[in-house]
Structure formats: C-alpha cells, structure tokens
C-alpha cells in the first residue's frame, strides 16, 4: 500500500482543508438531520447499516447460544421465533439493502462525474423513512405480545390475526412498508442520476461496472418492492379490517408465497449485484490490470437482472403447486452469467501484479465464500435433492454463504477501499488483516457444519432438538465459531474509530496508486460539489489515463483498452 502515488511533472498536489475549530454543540446532529449532500447521506447510510448489522448479529448469537445443546436453555419458543424473525428482517432490510444505497450514494455520483444525485431531497427522505421503518419493526419488542414471530418470510396462515394476534406483527408490517418506500425512492434516484447526470464523454459503456450493477439492481427494485409493499399491506388488511385476500379459498398460503418470493428472489440479486460491482472495482486496482471482458461483464449483469424475475418458485418446490422442470432449469440457467463474472474476475487477476492490501484480501474472501454458496445453490436447484433438504439447516447454510459471502465480505472490501476517499485517512492494514482472518475463520466454522447438520435432517427455525437426534456436536461447533465471528467486529470498530481520528493522512487523489474510475481524480475527501475540474473521458479508466498519460497510447496500441 502506498499513500503517495507516483508524482508526475507539473502535478499540483491537492491540499487538504484544515479543521475550522470547534463548532457549537448540536451542529453535527442538525447537519445530519437537514443534509441533502449525497456524500454525507452515503456515510450515514453506511454507519446506520452497520449499527443494524451489529444488532442483527447479537440476535444471531442469542439464537446460536440457545441451540448449543438439547433442551431450552434461556429462551422460550416464542422468544426464539421473535429473534429469528427480526434477525432475518434486520439483516436484509436494515443492513443489506441500505448499505447498497450507502456505497451508491457516495461513490456513484463521483464515478460518473456528477455534482450530486438527481433528487437530493428524495435521497434524504429515503434515508429517514428507512430508519423509521427499522425502528418500527424493532419497537415490537416493547409491546405486550413481543415482536413479530412468524418468520421473516411472513408465511400465512402463521401471520394472520388468529395465529399472530399481537401488535408486534402490525409494527413489523408497517416497518416493511416504510423500508420499501425508502428503497424505491433510492432506486428512482440512482436510475435518474445514471441516465441524466453523466459527465461529458461518459457514455453508458464507459461507466464503471459498479454503476452498471447499481443501475440494474435499481431497476429490479422498481419491479419488486412495490409488490412486497402491496402484498404486506394486504396482510394488514386481513389482520385489521377483516379482509379475505389470503383466505384458503382465494389461494391462501400459496398465493402469499408466490407474491413474497416474486419479491424475495430478485431481492437476493438486488443485494448481490452492487457487491459484484464493488469487487469489480477493487480487483483491477490491486491486480494492476484493466477489467478483463468489460462488455461481457455488463451483459452478464443485464442477464442476471432479466433472469432474476423467472426463478422465484424454486423456493416452493415442496408445495407441489409449481412446474418443477421450468423453475429448476431457470435456476440452473441463472448460474451461467454469474459464472461468466467469475471468469472475468479471474481473468483480471490472471498474470496480474496482485498486491494484497486489505481490500483485495476481503475480495478474495468474497470469491471463495460466494463460490461455495453458488455450488450449494446448484444442488438446491435440483428438485429431487431439494425435497430432502428443504427447510433444513442446509438451506440456512446456503443462504448465509451466498448473502454473507456477498454483502458482508464485499461491504468490508468497499469500506477498506473507499475509506480514504471518504475521510482523507487510511485504515490500519494490520488491524484490517486481523479483522479479515477472524471473520473468515469464524464464518466458515459457523456455517460449513450447518450443511452437514442439515443433511442429517435438522429442521430450521426450531428452538430445540433431542439428544438422540445426533445434532449436538455439530451445533456446538457452529455456536463456538459464531461467537468468534461476533468477536471479529471488535478490530473493525477499533480500526474505524482510531483511523478516523489518527490514521495516516492521504495527501493525493489516489492513495492506492492505480485507481481507474473518476472518484480517484478528485481530492480525499472530495469538495462539496465533487470536482474542481474533470479529466477527459475516453474509456472506462479516466483516472488511470489522467495519472499515467504516457501509458494511454501504448495500451491502446496493445488493445488493452477497448474503444467504446
């Protein structure tokens, strides 16, 4: 790692503004409440996402502690149900989706050379309505009947007023609706920003891969989140106003499953695609090479976006109410463009001069973990196998390998990669490596064994099991490693706090030395409107061409940079 990029002749060193002295108390809080600055909102999204990530992680530790040995330990069945319901919801709707908007809010306008997002006030509205929704869901714990306890999938009839009469369920539905509105607002903003605010010369096929992935994910959001919000309000209508939308005579549980999973499976790609984009930004910088197969990577992203709408019912194989061959085939098919992306990433690293700074280490953790999750997904796509392991811990393990592998590993890669751009200071490399290895070992120790305990027949969402079932040893291994995974956030939190105050100051535009996209062509942190001047944009690597002009003609001659 170098905090000092190679100097060029006539290169004017950017100056870092000095602190302006002590501000009045409450100034920061008022600034956050009223801001429409995409950079501050992006950091607020990221910080709050990680706060909710830690809350969801504590719930997970309580779940794992309860499953350490047979018999109920310290949670009742109802409390256990509430915890796994809120754990899943928090991780998906309060961490996974908002952290996408955190990175996209901060980085995307910089990458396309825009001064801000298209709708700054809508941006602020989306952030605050999302946080209100999350608080509403968690407020269920304060009600007499406790929080929602019907699972994060809200299956009916478990979620109707007869089986879940408490107010906590109503709070949960309100929270889902509010977070849905915030997500839709952010998606509209990103699509409009990309289509209308690109800098001169920034054609669609000169955009960074991260921007393409945010664009496709935002389009998916507009297609699925209104459906989730409407379907959830339908459940509320049944619960509170005596509606009969989900009566068994009208389709009941199967109708809800179709509506929910038509949202639920594309949502997995809303979570995955932006993080594919992050690793697609990290790998070329630390492999010292252009992205291999840029056009193919873009079309793989578009293919995933289209196919994501055609696989939802693979969650419903065991209902007997769907056409198994079609959904099995489509599930196998959607793995093809994802495999193409792996070849692009590996091709970029192939014969590159790889530098193992912390962002690249996290990216390799992503590649390994997500590959495992993808392979178990191929297994689950086969109905004969799925019949036996559906609703077991095998599915839990697969789900965590795909989502933790993408969202968490790539989020950490993004934080370590862009922290100097956001704050003007470097994170500590040694603490970053410690953080990575504790997380990597803790994660795989927790979830690898869950494949085996699921294959032995342990059902998910049960608070208890018998000693004679033979699940005890594997559950104990999983629980011990889950606490190691919980401990892994300590070096991360310490690293962020320490580096924000005392980290090595970045004095150049590009502390990594080989950045490609436009965010590396402005100061760290950027000025209020992002750029004092924009370089000429002739390819998808404008910052690299700005810093290494003598390389441009040679690379074009050797056809390393495409003419888009």
Curated annotation (Swiss-Prot):
GO terms for cellular component: plasma membrane. Binds 1 copper B ion per subunit. The keyword Magnesium does not apply. Its EC number is 7.1.1.9. It is found in: Cell membrane. It comes from the Bacteria. PROSITE patterns: COX1 (PS50855), COX1_CUB (PS00077). There is a cross-link at residues 265-269 (1'-histidyl-3'-tyrosine (His-Tyr)). Belongs to the heme-copper respiratory oxidase family. This is Cytochrome c oxidase subunit 1. It comes from Corynebacterium diphtheriae (strain ATCC 700971 / NCTC 13129 / Biotype gravis).
């Amino acid at each position: 790692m170098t905090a000092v990029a190679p100097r060029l002749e006539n290169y004017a060193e950017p100056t870092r503004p000095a602190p302006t002295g002590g501000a009045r108390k409450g100034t920061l809080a008022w600034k956050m409440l009223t801001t429409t600055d995409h950079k501050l909102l992006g950091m607020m999204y990221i910080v709050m996402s990680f706060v909710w990530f830690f809350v969801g992680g504590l719930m997970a530790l309580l779940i794992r502690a309860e499953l350490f040995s047979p018999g109920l330990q310290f949670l009742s069945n109802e409390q256990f149900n509430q915890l796994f319901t809120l754990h899943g919801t928090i991780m998906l709707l309060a961490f996974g989706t908002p952290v996408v908007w955190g990175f996209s809010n901060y980085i995307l306008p910089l990458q396309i050379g825009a001064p801000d997002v298209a709708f700054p006030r809508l941006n602020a509205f989306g952030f605050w309505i999302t946080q209100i929704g999350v608080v509403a869901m968690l407020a269920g714990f304060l009600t007499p009947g406790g929080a929602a306890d019907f699972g994060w999938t809200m299956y009916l009839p478990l979620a109707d007023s007869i089986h879940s009469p408490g107010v906590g369920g109503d709070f949960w539905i309100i929270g889902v609706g509010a977070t849905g509105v915030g997500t839709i607002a952010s998606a509209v903003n990103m699509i409009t920003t990309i289509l209308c605010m690109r800098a001169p010369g920034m054609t669609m096929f000169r955009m960074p891969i991260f921007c393409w992935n945010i664009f496709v994910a935002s389009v998916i959001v507009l297609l699925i989140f209104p459906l989730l919000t409407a379907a959830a309000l339908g459940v509320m209508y049944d619960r509170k106003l005596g509606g009969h939308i989900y009566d068994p005579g009208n389709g009941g549980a199967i109708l809800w499953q179709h509506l929910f999973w038509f949202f639920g499976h594309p949502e997995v790609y809303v979570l995955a695609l932006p993080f594919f984009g992050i690793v697609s930004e990290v790998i070329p910088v630390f492999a010292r090479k252009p992205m291999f197969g840029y056009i193919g990577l873009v079309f793989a992203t578009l293919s995933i976006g289209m196919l994501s709408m055609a696989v939802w019912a693979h969650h419903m194989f065991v209902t007997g109410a769907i056409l198994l061959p079609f959904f099995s085939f489509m599930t196998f098919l959607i793995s093809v463009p994802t495999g193409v992306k792996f070849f692009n990433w590996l091709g970029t690293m192939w014969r590159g001069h790889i530098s193992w700074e912390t962002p690249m280490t996290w990216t390799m953790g992503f590649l390994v973990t997500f590959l495992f999750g993808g392979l178990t997904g191929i297994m689950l796509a086969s109905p004969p196998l799925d019949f036996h392991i559906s609703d077991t811990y095998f599915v839990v393990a697969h789900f965590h390998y795909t989502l933790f592998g993408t969202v968490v590993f790539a989020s950490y890669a993004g934080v370590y990669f862009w922290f100097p751009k956001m704050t003007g200071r470097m994170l500590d490399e040694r603490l970053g490596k410690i953080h990575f290895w504790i997380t990597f070992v803790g994660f795989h120790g927790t979830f690898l064994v869950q494949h085996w305990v699921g294959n032995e027949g342990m059902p998910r969402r049960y608070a208890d099991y018998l000693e004679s079932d033979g699940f005890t040893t594997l559950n104990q291994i999983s629980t011990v490693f889950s606490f190691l995974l919980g401990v892994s956030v300590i070096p991360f939190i310490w690293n962020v706090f320490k580096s924000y105050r005392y980290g090595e100051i970045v004095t150049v535009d590009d502390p990594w030395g080989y950045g490609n996209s436009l965010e590396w062509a402005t100061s760290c942190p950027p000025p209020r409107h992002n750029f004092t001047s924009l370089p000429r944009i002739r390819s998808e690597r404008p910052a690299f061409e700005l810093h290494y002009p003598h390389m441009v003609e040679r690379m074009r001659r050797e056809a390393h940079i495409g003419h888009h």
